[in-house]
Amino acid sequence: MEEIRGLSYEQNKKYQFAIASGYFDEWEADPRKWKHTFIGAFIWKYPSRVKVLNILTDIIGNSPTWEDMSDDVLRDFVDDLTENVAPSSAKTYCAELKSVLNENKRRIPCTDFMKILSVKGTATQSVYLTAHEMELFVAYKPRTNIEQYVHRNFCVSMLTGARQVDAGRLTISNCDIETNMLSYVPQKTPGVIVRVPVDERHGLRNFLADSNLEPCCLDTYNDVVRKICRCVGIDTICTVVKAGKNETAPKWKLTSSHTARRSFATNLYLAGVSLEDIAMMMGHGKNIETTKRYICAERNLNPNVMSYFQPAQSQS
């Protein structure tokens, strides 16, 4: 058992998962100060909920702080949960985070966290970009460095199914010319190798070659995604279900960084690709239940299914 000086044996045992995950690294320098950080306050109250901190770290790109608790970060947190855990678990995690934020609400920029994190134990519904809307987004010409970064990474994520954190790391060197496959090891699941066919229709190689761009924070990223969607006319009026309530708005208003992976999964599904294959390409392995949460549309029954129920043709 890894031990932290200043903690009792029982405390070391109680917080072992968090210690092993590196969340107690700053403890010994100043225990009192550490307990007043976001990580300290959350872990001290919920020692077994390292998963919540890991999700926030993936979203933000660094260890979460009070200052990181913005509207967009919390909305992406809810999106991530609803796509990767059961609705009942998402409700529990959100309630726990809400409790910690409520005790420290003067320290965070988000004033609407109670509403954002009020998740019911029911499934949510989100938007995706259709094949035509994907073409519109890909064709957009960025006007600033920030737009170039967001446009590039969103397109890579949308064309490969990679998480945002992985999309930023992918380059042309991840492509195999002989097999025309892109392969990489996800940051979230380092023991897995993901392989995806290179999308030649939308010029994926060009986006992969355009790397080393200056990153931006998640709030800015989502704002730019919505701006681009609005500029290219992705404005169909949509009604989605969030936290058990209907929300109606132009589609561009309902998009975020997560829309890229949803678009990848949903369009493949509508094209008839099996959930098992989509799961492999998204790094979910054999866990198709996780993949199902990224599917935002229903597809028609295969003609072979319909023919099965038809009477056999009699031969004359």
What are these language model-derived features?
Residues 5-84, 99-106, 113-115:
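Basic/aromatic-enriched alpha-helical hairpins
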Residues 55, 83-115, 161-165, 226-228, ...:
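N-terminal DNA-binding recognition helix of tyrosine site-specific recombinases/integrases
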Residues 91, 115-164, 168:
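Basic, Lys/Arg- and aromatic-enriched nucleic-acid-binding interface segment
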Residues 169-206:
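Conserved tyrosine-mediated DNA breakage-rejoining catalytic core shared by Y-recombinases
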